[in-house]
Amino acid sequence: MRNKVPTGRLGGTLVSRELVKYPDVFLRKVSKDVAFPLDDKTKRLITWMTRAMYQHNGIGVAAVQVGYDVRMFTMDCTRYQGKPQVFINPTIVKNSEETITDFEGCLSAPGKQGEVKRHIRITLNYKDEEGEEHQKTFYNMEARCIQHEMDHLEGKLCIDYEKGEYSRDKHNAQTMVDTDFRTKSDS
């Protein structure tokens, strides 16, 4: 972890669930492996990350998004069931040849989206909170979310995948300009 005390990059305590926001360069850090057994501070960080994910209506949060450059993220693509998963020191070991391209948003880049091509199936090696190793295959939305969070661990953001001139962010900005222009000229 970046800090020895339970305060993150943002300087707040683990009670505050602020997120590191783009363009903060901390989001570009490559995360370090988590040591086992987990200490109490790391366990509290997992709880903090999970709460931040739900508080900000997300489906995944990487530790770097809450100010810690460690290889860990939480995910809950079925959050209505309230079953968050924790992935520590994850590695993608296999992915499908088949991909799908779609827009992705990010809690650390509010209002911005990037068009990202992702594998529809991945196999992941990771450890859980007890240090037990797992290998599991994920599909569709879970696979996309994991790839997104894995990018965070490598210092990448979904907006880095921007293709061409069109993006929803650019489109929305142009729409706002057009709307603002019409409103002013109609008065």
Language-model segments: which ranges?
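Positively charged
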Residues: 2-187
